[in-house]
Amino acid sequence: SGSNCFHFEKFQGWNGIAFEPSKIQFEKLEKNRKCKLVNKPINEKQKEVDFFEVEEGLTQMSGIYDDNFISEQLIKNDKNSKFKKIKLLTTTFEENISHETEIDYISIDIEGVELNVLHSIDFNKYLIKVISVENNSPDKNDFKLFFNEKNFNFFDRVGQDEIFYNNKYFNF
């Protein structure tokens, strides 16, 4: 399915929440996922954003359209891709996760606004064990610096994802 969380849900019995603003991708999730699904983009605060919806072709490249949206040229150059820009209202981590305080795993792949969402999480309130984030610019240390401040260590890079673990739970 291309999902970091799918394995844990399907084979380990984990439950969670998936944020998917793309209408096309959300409909696919509804067919094969049991976790809570939210058909909105997640961001650091609730606001209206421009969303780049890829309807055909590179549909996995949809994302919030801002200065950090790195996929635009790739999508526009792909002759099989059809896309449109639409307005969507974002939701926040806190609005959807506030009842949980201990979280085994979070996977964040939101096409360039990962750090915005990470900055909005209260790491003193939520005890998160492992976080993976998509990082299309591995030469930048933004994530490593952020997680170091939160007492997380870098574990590994798998494809475009960097995995960090909380020192409170693991001692390697």
Model-found features: residue ranges?
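Phosphate/nucleotide-binding beta-alpha loop and adjacent structural elements of enzyme active sites
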Residues: 1-172
